Protein backbone atom coordinates (compact mmCIF):
# COMPACT_ATOMS: atom_id res chain seq x y z
CA UNK A 1 0.00 0.00 0.00
CA UNK A 2 1.23 3.50 -0.84
CA UNK A 3 2.20 5.82 2.04
CA UNK A 4 -0.19 8.60 3.02
CA UNK A 5 1.11 12.18 3.18
CA UNK A 6 -0.67 15.08 4.85
CA UNK A 7 0.57 18.55 5.73
CA UNK A 8 -0.49 21.75 7.42
CA UNK A 9 0.98 25.23 7.86
CA UNK A 10 1.20 26.51 11.43
CA UNK A 11 1.70 30.22 12.07
CA UNK A 12 4.02 29.74 15.05
CA UNK A 13 7.84 29.87 15.37
CA UNK A 14 9.61 26.52 14.98
CA UNK A 15 10.90 26.54 18.57
CA UNK A 16 7.35 26.65 19.92
CA UNK A 17 6.06 24.16 17.33
CA UNK A 18 8.77 21.69 18.36
CA UNK A 19 8.03 22.11 22.08
CA UNK A 20 4.26 21.74 21.69
CA UNK A 21 4.61 18.76 19.32
CA UNK A 22 6.85 16.83 21.72
CA UNK A 23 6.01 17.73 25.34
CA UNK A 24 3.67 15.09 26.86
CA UNK A 25 1.55 17.72 28.65
CA UNK A 26 0.97 19.53 25.36
CA UNK A 27 0.40 16.32 23.38
CA UNK A 28 -2.47 15.45 25.75
CA UNK A 29 -4.08 18.80 24.87
CA UNK A 30 -3.92 18.67 21.07
CA UNK A 31 -3.72 14.99 20.04
CA UNK A 32 -7.36 14.37 19.10
CA UNK A 33 -9.62 14.38 16.08
CA UNK A 34 -12.65 16.06 17.67
CA UNK A 35 -14.07 17.20 20.99
CA UNK A 36 -15.30 13.63 21.54
CA UNK A 37 -11.72 12.27 21.60
CA UNK A 38 -8.84 12.73 24.00
CA UNK A 39 -5.36 11.51 24.86
CA UNK A 40 -5.44 10.84 28.60
CA UNK A 41 -1.85 9.57 28.67
CA UNK A 42 1.26 10.58 26.73
CA UNK A 43 4.85 9.48 27.25
CA UNK A 44 7.60 10.70 24.95
CA UNK A 45 11.32 9.87 25.11
CA UNK A 46 12.37 11.90 22.05
CA UNK A 47 15.68 10.34 20.97
CA UNK A 48 16.71 7.53 18.63
CA UNK A 49 15.70 4.33 20.41
CA UNK A 50 13.33 6.26 22.71
CA UNK A 51 9.67 5.36 22.97
CA UNK A 52 6.47 7.24 22.21
CA UNK A 53 3.32 5.94 23.91
CA UNK A 54 -0.04 7.64 23.50
CA UNK A 55 -3.34 6.31 24.78
CA UNK A 56 -6.13 7.74 22.64
CA UNK A 57 -9.84 7.19 22.96
CA UNK A 58 -13.36 8.44 23.06
CA UNK A 59 -14.11 10.56 26.12
CA UNK A 60 -17.17 8.42 26.85
CA UNK A 61 -14.91 5.37 27.24
CA UNK A 62 -16.51 3.51 24.34
CA UNK A 63 -13.24 2.96 22.48
CA UNK A 64 -9.52 3.46 23.08
CA UNK A 65 -6.21 2.32 21.64
CA UNK A 66 -2.49 2.54 22.32
CA UNK A 67 -0.25 4.27 19.80
CA UNK A 68 3.26 2.98 20.52
CA UNK A 69 6.45 3.56 18.56
CA UNK A 70 10.24 3.65 18.81
CA UNK A 71 12.09 6.64 17.36
CA UNK A 72 14.48 5.90 14.50
CA UNK A 73 15.77 9.42 13.82
CA UNK A 74 15.35 12.81 15.49
CA UNK A 75 16.77 16.06 14.07
CA UNK A 76 15.73 18.95 16.32
CA UNK A 77 13.38 21.44 14.62
CA UNK A 78 13.58 19.44 11.34
CA UNK A 79 12.62 15.78 11.28
CA UNK A 80 11.27 12.85 13.29
CA UNK A 81 10.86 9.25 12.17
CA UNK A 82 9.61 6.28 14.13
CA UNK A 83 8.46 2.70 13.72
CA UNK A 84 5.22 1.57 15.30
CA UNK A 85 5.21 -1.66 17.31
CA UNK A 86 3.32 -3.31 14.44
CA UNK A 87 6.16 -2.39 12.03
CA UNK A 88 4.64 0.54 10.13
CA UNK A 89 6.84 3.62 9.69
CA UNK A 90 6.05 7.32 9.97
CA UNK A 91 8.06 10.44 9.17
CA UNK A 92 7.34 14.03 10.19
CA UNK A 93 9.12 16.89 8.44
CA UNK A 94 9.14 20.44 9.88
CA UNK A 95 9.89 23.05 7.19
CA UNK A 96 10.35 26.79 7.74
CA UNK A 97 10.82 28.87 10.86
CA UNK A 98 7.59 30.94 11.01
CA UNK A 99 5.28 29.77 9.62
CA UNK A 100 6.18 26.09 9.87
CA UNK A 101 4.85 23.45 7.50
CA UNK A 102 4.42 20.07 9.16
CA UNK A 103 4.34 17.17 6.70
CA UNK A 104 3.57 13.68 7.97
CA UNK A 105 4.04 10.61 5.79
CA UNK A 106 3.00 7.24 7.16
CA UNK A 107 2.36 3.69 6.08
CA UNK A 108 -1.37 2.96 6.37
CA UNK A 109 -2.67 -0.08 8.20
CA UNK A 110 -4.47 -2.83 6.30
CA UNK A 111 -7.64 -2.74 8.41
CA UNK A 112 -9.05 0.74 7.77
CA UNK A 113 -9.88 2.59 4.54
CA UNK A 114 -7.05 4.85 3.35
CA UNK A 115 -9.39 7.87 3.22
CA UNK A 116 -10.36 7.34 6.86
CA UNK A 117 -6.69 7.15 7.90
CA UNK A 118 -5.88 10.31 5.92
CA UNK A 119 -8.86 12.14 7.46
CA UNK A 120 -7.80 11.05 10.97
CA UNK A 121 -4.26 12.37 10.48
CA UNK A 122 -5.53 15.63 8.92
CA UNK A 123 -7.86 16.15 11.90
CA UNK A 124 -5.00 15.62 14.37
CA UNK A 125 -2.81 18.11 12.47
CA UNK A 126 -5.68 20.63 12.41
CA UNK A 127 -6.08 20.19 16.17
CA UNK A 128 -2.34 20.80 16.63
CA UNK A 129 -2.51 23.97 14.50
CA UNK A 130 -5.43 25.34 16.52
CA UNK A 131 -3.70 24.53 19.83
CA UNK A 132 -0.29 25.89 18.76
CA UNK A 133 -1.65 29.16 17.38
CA UNK A 134 -3.70 29.68 20.55
CA UNK A 135 -0.61 28.98 22.71
CA UNK A 136 1.38 31.57 20.79
CA UNK A 137 -1.09 34.19 22.04
CA UNK A 138 -0.32 33.15 25.64
CA UNK A 139 2.86 35.02 26.70
CA UNK A 140 3.62 32.49 29.47
CA UNK A 141 3.98 29.71 26.86
CA UNK A 142 5.69 31.44 23.93
Where are these regions (language model features)?
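Hydrophobic/aromatic beta-strand elements that line small-molecule binding cavities or substrate pockets
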Residues: 6-8, 41-44, 67-72, 89-96
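Short, highly charged C-terminal tails/helix-capping segments
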Residues: 131-142
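Hydrophobic pocket/interface hotspot
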Residues: 17-20, 27, 52-54, 71, ...
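A short, structured loop/turn motif at beta-sheet edges
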Residues: 13-15, 46-47, 72-77, 93-101
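Glycine-centered tight beta-turn/hairpin loop motif at sheet-sheet or coil-to-beta transitions
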Residues: 1, 62, 85-87
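Beta-strand/loop substructures that line and gate deep hydrophobic ligand-binding cavities in soluble
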Residues: 79-123, 127-130
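Hydrophobic ligand-binding cavity/cleft-lining segments
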Residues: 1-37
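Glycine-rich portal/gate segments that line the openings of hydrophobic small-molecule binding cavities
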Residues: 39-83
Amino acid sequence: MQPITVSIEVNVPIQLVWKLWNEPGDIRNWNNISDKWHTPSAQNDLRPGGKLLLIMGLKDGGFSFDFEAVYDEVRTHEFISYTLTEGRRSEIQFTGTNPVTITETFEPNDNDPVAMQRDFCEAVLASFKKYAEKQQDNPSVA
